[in-house]
């Protein structure tokens, strides 16, 4: 079956998005059409995950490990990091309202709180616009650590910015945990 989906209300000056999707499933009504579109949309997330894992951040393919067992362990660790990065990318706009605890532990959350005053500027435009303890709030902090300027008119942070920010954050969080040792 062929499913064709075209964007309506296209912004001025932009061409409408048109998808032509081939499926082996019988598409006999609108509900099934939207189910096929939903599957395609999920496929995009999966492709983004593997792009983050391999090329756009963690460079798993650059590993020089030759032992299969070690490569499997590295892949598992990298997959967890890629998953967190993708959660941050998807939460950055604040629409999901997800809790930061789905990606960060309580000690890491304390570190996020401690870092926030250092990352926010003096004006309202330079402050984290998201409710505290949400994943969008945490994503804003991680993106700032990754080099994003934080202004609403700037290009939104992507996987590479989040990878840099998350790597830096993990080091800071480890140091924060050791502060009372």
Residue ranges and their predicted role:
Residues 1-181:
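Single, function-defining residue in the core of a domain
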